[in-house]
A protein has these predicted regions:
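FIC/Doc superfamily catalytic core
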Residues: 1-316
Length: 316
């Protein structure tokens, strides 16, 4: 991939086909494979797979994996909300979840509403996860519906609070509709926007894609292409969790990879900017950053599992 075309070839910018080549190989998969072959990316993926393999056999997940997944959804919502500026304690969210008081998009507390939306989206992901012990394997909706459903959960509270229009919830941008949030670089419009969205949908559904690279690029495209007017970064982080579970990299569904962006926001922005540069160097740097976020999420999952096993996870 020529240096300045790395991102374009992955995501189908104007002039770059996302269809099948004469040999039957998808250009998207070819570009992803080239990113995955980078030495730093290979090392990062190996580290992620090793850490996730160790997590898979945590003793707490033998019988209490459902509780662990539910707690991960709470911790993920708290962490992701913090990235978006909504600061709510895990204890407060747990209390509302236990009381069943989060059925409405607006409670009068904008911070709680935002985090509750993220929790609803995370809980939806849990419902799509295969059983960790057993044979249950729920049907996951196609990519376009998947994006719309997650965005409705995330952006519903924004609409209820008057921050976005109802017509923007779950509906991707088209034409020259502008975004309401910042991100790395200028958000695409018109033909480029349509091409980036189609490339994103293809990437989510592509078979045999390198898993870590796929999850990282999907996240980065949500940040840089910004297919919705608002809530793109939060949906991107949710998609990382979904894809790593679906593709078998992190089958437990307990890694809280949302923690890392909140702990080191400067590194998050810098890595996203590197991706948006469009160079192979920048794309690889972003994938390595995503691997670091997953590793931090696995560490949190190990702590979560210890707390679940000890019966103390509701205390923090």
């Amino acid at each position: 991939v020529p240096k300045r075309r790395a991102q374009a070839e992955v995501m189908g910018r104007p002039g770059v086909s996302t269809g099948r080549s004469n040999a039957g190989e998808s250009p998207v998969l070819k570009a992803l494979s080239q990113v995955a072959a980078d030495e730093r990316v290979r090392a990062a993926e190996a580290a992620v797979r090793e850490a996730c393999g160790e997590l898979r056999w945590n003793e707490a997940l033998r019988r209490r994996w459902r509780e662990a997944r539910a707690e991960a959804a709470i911790r993920g919502a708290i962490a992701s909300g913090g990235v978006e500026g909504a600061v709510v304690s895990a204890e407060v969210l747990r209390e509302h979840v236990a009381a069943g008081s989060l059925t409405e998009a607006a409670t009068g507390d904008p911070g709680l509403d935002a985090v509750a939306g993220l929790w609803r989206a995370g809980s939806r992901l849990v419902g799509w996860m295969p059983d960790l012990v057993g044979r249950g394997r729920p049907v996951v909706p196609p990519a376009r519906s998947l994006l719309a459903m997650l965005h409705r959960d995330v952006a519903g509270p924004l609409a209820a609070g008057g921050r976005v229009g109802l017509e923007e919830v779950g509906v991707p941008r088209t034409g020259r509709i502008r975004v309401r949030e910042g991100g790395p670089g200028a958000a695409p419009q018109e033909e480029e926007l349509a091409a980036r969205l189609e490339g994103l949908l293809e990437l989510i559904e592509a078979e045999r894609a390198p898993a870590l690279v796929r999850a990282a690029i999907v996240h980065a495209e949500m940040l840089s292409a910004r297919p919705f007017t608002a809530g793109n970064a939060a949906v991107g982080r949710l998609l990382v969790r979904h894809l790593l579970v679906r593709d078998g990299v992190e089958p437990t569904g307990t890694a809280v990879s949302d923690l890392y962006p909140g702990r080191v926001p400067g590194a998050y922005a810098e890595a996203a900017g590197a991706y948006a540069s469009g160079t192979m160097e920048g794309v690889a740097a972003w994938v390595v950053w995503q691997a670091e976020a997953v590793l931090a999420g696995v560490q949190e999952a190990q702590r979560l599992c210890r707390a679940v096993q000890a019966g103390t996870w509701r205390a923090g």
